[in-house]
Amino acid sequence: MLTGWKEPIVLDKDADIVNMKPLADDGDTYIIYNDGYKDEFYMLENRQKQGNEAGLYASGLMITHVDYSQEAWEANDVNTTRERYAIMAADNSKARTIPDVEGDLYPFNGNNSFGNTTIPAATLNHANTDGSKLLNKEITDITKNADGTISFKFRNNNTTGISEINAESSKPAIYNMNGIMMGYDLDKLPKGIYLWKGKKVKK
């Protein structure tokens, strides 16, 4: 993701996702926001060993934590001071050897859930609406189907602030021509050519 070519689907209400297609088959990406800080979110993608992703070491649901900062992205300092873009490995290993990478995607060895109390857990860098640094949303019953699709259940356990944040987070992100996310307000960006709502926009 973060390429600007396809807008992710926001998960903010309880939902059962069935037969989510692989990214290589133009499948959807889902996004779950920190309700207290819209630039922090989790992305869900179905990554399968097929097409232009045939060389992957694993297949399944990839959960990525993003703590977006325009300054960090522009300076290429995304993961220097802290992790702003990281895969939440199903085996809870940050090692990059092949055996460890093979355990990155869900489900893996019985781990088919992601939430406040799972390992790894859905933690945050910025406070949520309740003051905690927990997402308060969970993904359960992650299943990899025989045809390469993924199914899972999403539950929103937040009780405050949801409607207000949804209005903000529904704004489409803006990207530069290198696929770097620049923010949400075109008026605040310098002159140039951007990708917005899937189209090139000149400011």
Task: Annotate the PLM regions.
Residues 1-3:
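Extended catalytic-interface subdomain
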Residues 159-203:
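C-terminal outer-membrane/trafficking sorting elements
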Residues 9-159:
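Non-catalytic C-terminal accessory/binding modules of secreted extracellular proteins
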